Amino acid sequence: MNEKKQKQRGLKQGFELIYKYRFVLSFLLLIMLVSFKISGSSMGCWKLFLGDGESGIRLGEPRVWRSDEWGTLTPLCFRQQYNTLGAYNRYSQTLGSILTDNMLVYGQPSWDILTLFRPFYWGYLFFGSERGLSWFWCSRLIVLFLSWFELGMFITDGKKKLSVMLSVCVSFAPFLQWWFAINGLVEMLIYGACFVLVQVCRKPSGRQRSD
């Protein structure tokens, strides 16, 4: 019986440490995922057109019906590295004979003041296409999870388990995962949660966090 209590106490202490250092651990997790070029892209679908070769798939399988991602957004972002006007230029003539504003077409990564407000594209600018894609996918999922966990802590008066459940339900909702890479849906949920949290922090509250 004492051994069981010790295990429970050890687990509780472990979870408390994770909670205490959640931001540091999340950042380290992001670094690891980006280092190994991990993403949820369905770029493996290009194998259907390019023939046999290493697909790079380690878990799951590419989803053909997510063509807005692997057939449009991701190739456009990759194209930016090879922009004939300079890597990640705001304008491009790579396709077509006239200048195209890359910030207006799917909001592609560009060396432009507007990209300061699009941190999930910074990976492309600093790490290149492969790790930029990983940064785009992993940073959005991690920040989405954290922001909704913090919002859950406010909504539930500091109940960690309920907050984790809320964060999981939002982050892995089928509708959200279907449109995860495009349409700015993830960013909308992140900024919405952060906006509420900022407003909460600006106003004194008597709520106390608890287990």
For the regions a protein language model found, what residue spans apply to each?
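Start-transfer (signal-anchor) and selected internal transmembrane alpha helices
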Residues: 1-43
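Hydrophobic membrane-targeting alpha-helices
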Residues: 37, 147-155, 196, 200
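Short secondary-structure junctions and interdomain/linker hinges
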Residues: 38-41, 126, 130, 204
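Active-site lumenal/periplasmic loops and adjacent helix-entry segments of GT-C-fold
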Residues: 46-188
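Alpha-helical multipass membrane-protein architecture
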Residues: 181-183, 207-211
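Catalytic-core regions of glycoside hydrolase
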Residues: 187-191, 211
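Membrane-interface transmembrane helices that cradle and orient dolichyl/undecaprenyl
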Residues: 193-209
